[in-house]
């Protein structure tokens, strides 16, 4: 090919490239340019911005608008996926009892909830629920095996569960064959001379374990006394951000009759005329973050009392009631979830989920 032919061919190639390029940048798809971010200081340091700054400029905001639409769709889908209280809870099913607090938190009674809706919702969330329990000294032989056996059968059936078992002698742990989706972790704790100190120090211990590992392992956490037995399904209807348990002996009483700590010197002090319910420290729970806050605040109160040489009337339970007075629980469990059969079985107790064991204090406690 002569020189003239080469020149003509080169001009044709260049013209073709220019035309293709011109058509491309004016098409909706013509936005895939890359420019070194270091040459565009306005873009800033964001790796996300670096990727889409020039395409957005070429397309006059086309990609930004598209992103806004996608974000709106994602937000809408997220809102639709959230479970509303009315989706699973009907307070009017039990008109004879209190089913809603003044601050609009549900009080869960048998008949007020739809567990199938909740099970389906939480299964999609792929939650794991934790349960802490303490057994020290003779509490191990008298209560731990029955507690764990019944929990294995009734607690959060169908969902992954981790039992966190705190004992002062690991060698005395009962052998329990756990069902599917269940596991346990056993931790040795330091024994205390008085049962009151064991009760109060558990707040510190639970908080330490939440910080160390529990917060990374579960979505919800319950803390329970070992001298109880599950009688029926204790399910996902109990889950919430901050969960308190009504005390079986006091759920019908006037707040002025509650056995709150009434001494002003105590950090757990609640004056007459104040208070909503009397809560039982045998069961409380929530998200790990909320349970951590509960345990830390209660332990602060306990330490303050020790410094002032005072001990609240009902120890950690007094401090728990003070906490829930100041920080209202987002869900409350009826006495059906922690019932004492010594009371009998009133008509409003439809289905007992968990019951107290016989309190053999003279046998299990070193100091009564």
Curated annotation (Swiss-Prot):
CDD domains reported in the protein's UniProt record: Glyco_transf_6
Record pathway: Protein modification; protein glycosylation
Listed Gene3D superfamilies: Spore Coat Polysaccharide Biosynthesis Protein SpsA, Chain A
Top-level taxon of the source organism: Eukaryota
UniProt: substrate binding residues: 134-139, 225-227, 247-250, 259, 359-365
EC number: 2.4.1.87
Residue intervals passing through the bilayer: 7-22
Bilayer topology term: Single-pass type II membrane protein
Entries under Pfam families matching the protein: Glyco_transf_6 (PF03414)
PANTHER family hit by this protein: GLYCOSYLTRANSFERASE-RELATED (PTHR10462), N-ACETYLLACTOSAMINIDE ALPHA-1,3-GALACTOSYLTRANSFERASE (PTHR10462:SF26)
Protein name stated in the entry: N-acetyllactosaminide alpha-1,3-galactosyltransferase
Organism of derivation: Bos taurus
Gene, per the UniProt record: GGTA1
């Amino acid at each position: 090919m002569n020189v003239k032919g080469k020149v003509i061919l080169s001009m044709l190639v260049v013209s073709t490239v220019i035309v293709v390029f011109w058509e491309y940048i004016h098409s909706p798809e013509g936005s895939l340019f890359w420019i070194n971010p270091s040459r565009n200081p306005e873009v800033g340091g964001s790796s996300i911005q670096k990727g889409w700054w020039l395409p957005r400029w070429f397309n006059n905001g086309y990609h930004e608008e598209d992103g806004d639409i996608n974000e709106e769709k994602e937000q809408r889908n997220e809102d639709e996926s959230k479970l509303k209280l009315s989706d699973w809870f009907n307070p009017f099913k039990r008109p004879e009892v209190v089913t809603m607090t003044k601050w609009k938190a549900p009080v869960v009674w048998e008949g007020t909830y739809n567990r199938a809706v909740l099970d389906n919702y939480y299964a999609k969330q792929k939650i794991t629920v934790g349960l802490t329990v303490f057994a020290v000294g003779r509490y191990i032989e008298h209560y731990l095996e029955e507690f764990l056996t019944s929990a294995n059968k009734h607690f959060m059936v169908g969902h992954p569960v981790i039992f966190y078992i705190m004992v002062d002698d690991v060698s005395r742990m009962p052998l329990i064959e756990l069902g599917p989706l269940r596991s346990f972790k056993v931790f040795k704790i330091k024994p205390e001379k008085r049962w009151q100190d064991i009760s109060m120090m558990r707040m510190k211990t639970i908080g330490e374990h939440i910080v160390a590992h529990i917060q990374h392992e579960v979505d919800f956490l319950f803390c329970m006394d070992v001298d109880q037995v599950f009688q029926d399904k204790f399910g996902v209807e109990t889950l919430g951000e901050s969960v308190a348990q009504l005390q079986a002996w006091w759920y019908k009483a006037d707040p002025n009759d509650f056995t709150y700590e009434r001494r002003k010197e105590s950090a757990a002090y609640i004056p007459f005329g104040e208070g909503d319910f009397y809560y039982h420290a045998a069961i409380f729970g929530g998200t790990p973050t909320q349970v951590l806050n509960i345990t830390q605040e209660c332990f602060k109160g306990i330490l303050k009392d020790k410094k002032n040489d005072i001990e609240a009337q009902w120890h950690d339970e007094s401090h728990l009631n003070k906490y829930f007075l100041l920080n209202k629980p987002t869900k409350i469990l009826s006495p059906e979830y922690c019932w004492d059969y010594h009371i009998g079985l009133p008509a409003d107790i439809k289905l007992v989920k968990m019951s107290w064991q016989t309190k053999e204090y003279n046998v299990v406690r070193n100091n009564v």
